[in-house]
A protein has these predicted regions:
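Conserved Rossmann-fold dehydrogenase catalytic segment
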Residues: 166-174, 197-203, 209-228, 247-254, ...
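Short Gly/Pro-enriched turn/cap motifs at secondary-structure boundaries
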Residues: 63-64, 72, 249-254, 260-261
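Glycine-rich beta-alpha junction loops
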Residues: 46, 135-137, 224-229, 266, ...
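Oxidoreductase and adenylate-handling cofactor-binding alpha/beta cores
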Residues: 182-201, 217-218, 230, 234-242, ...
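Active-site-adjacent beta-strand anchor residues
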Residues: 18, 85, 107, 222-225, ...
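Aromatic-enriched alpha-helical interface/lid elements that frame and gate functional surfaces
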Residues: 255-315
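Short, surface-exposed loop/helix-turn segments at secondary-structure junctions
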Residues: 52-60, 238-247
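N-terminal helix-loop segment corresponding to the beta1-alpha1 unit
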Residues: 1-213
Length: 315
């Protein structure tokens, strides 16, 4: 953070306009800022980013109201801020003047919103890297639908895999699709900047062997659900090749044991993962049960997976 604050880092000299709200687009812009980019946050006058209203809150001495949002403290840091109503003619003009000085714009409005305001990619400089985050992407039958993180993890398939086998699906503990998509979008933005400025991307211009070419920007379409699809391990391949419809497994895995969160004597839990034969042998020694390594049910990973209930119960 000290390098970024001082304008150092690999993205020093790059300017990012964060016109998003809630988590995904601001998080993407924040990651670029941590790499040294100059990030400018654009917020609606009076209302500001919705994250300012998300708790928990820290009381501010001498001020009324709920206090200072910790959500905003985490995701709104590391950037300068301006207010600008993009729905008004004056606001549109101010935004265009600001974007003319920038390299990247990050937004996560419902698809079509920026175009309706006259601020879509075709209305802005052609060398801009335009990051667009939404639940379902910028095209397709679901594109116009609004939504937040929960729909991303549901439509992407993660929600159905989270929880106990005999219970309803459970939301992960954090907003996974928002944060994950922010990471993928930041990676794509850096790649697009490299392609634009070094000339090995679709719009490489002069550096790509065209002496009269102009550097080209990119429009990055980053759907929440697609980020979730990318981390589903073997789920899609298993269905495509073997017809397996993966189900919830709780804390355990069908092919690996021992693996669980085990209760402790002080009323807490300890996470133990000992899938490999070497790790299992060390665990048995720590439990003072070395004979378990010779038990036919536990002699190797496949055997332990087939008898996961037995070995997890012993542990």
């Amino acid at each position: 953070m000290s390098d970024a604050a001082a304008g150092a880092g690999p993205l020093a000299g790059i300017r990012v306009i964060d016109v998003g709200t809630r988590i995904s687009a601001p998080f993407c812009a924040g990651l670029l800022g941590e790499l040294g980019a100059d990030v400018i946050k654009v917020e609606l006058p009076g209302e500001g980013d919705f994250m300012r209203t998300m708790g928990p809150f820290v009381p501010v001495e001498g001020e009324g109201g709920a206090g200072y949002s910790l959500s905003w403290a985490v995701e709104g840091r590391g950037r300068r801020g301006v207010t600008c109503d993009l729905r008004q003619p004056e606001g549109k003009e101010l935004f265009k003047r600001l974007v003319a000085t920038a390299d990247v714009v990050c937004e996560n409005f419902r698809p079509g919103t920026m175009e309706r305001w006259g601020l879509g990619p075709d209305d802005l400089p052609s060398d801009l890297v335009f990051v667009r985050i939404s639940v379902f992407g910028q095209s397709g039958p679901y594109a116009p639908r609004p939504g937040l993180d929960r729909l991303g993890i549901a439509f992407g398939g993660l929600l159905n895999l989270t929880g106990e086998p005999d219970r309803p699906p459970v939301r992960p503990g954090v907003t996974v699709s928002d944060y994950l998509t922010g990471v993928f979008a930041a990676f794509a933005a850096v790649s697009a900047l490299y392609g634009r400025d070094v000339g090995r991307g679709p719009g490489g211009g002069a550096a790509n062997g065209d002496p009269d070419g102009e550097p080209g920007g990119e429009v990055i379409d980053a759907p929440l659900y697609a980020s979730i699809l990318r981390i589903l391990e073997w789920t899609l391949a298993g269905y495509d090749t073997l017809g397996i419809v993966r189900q919830r497994e709780g804390n355990r895995l069908a092919h690996s044991a021992p693996l669980d969160n085990y209760p402790t004597g002080d009323g807490s839990y300890i996470c133990i993962v000992a899938g490999s034969d070497a790790n299992f042998a060390r665990l048995c020694a720590a439990m003072e049960r070395p004979e378990l390594t010779e038990d036919p049910r536990f002699v190797n990973l496949a055997a332990r997976g087939a008898h996961g209930g037995d070995i997890n119960g012993i542990v």
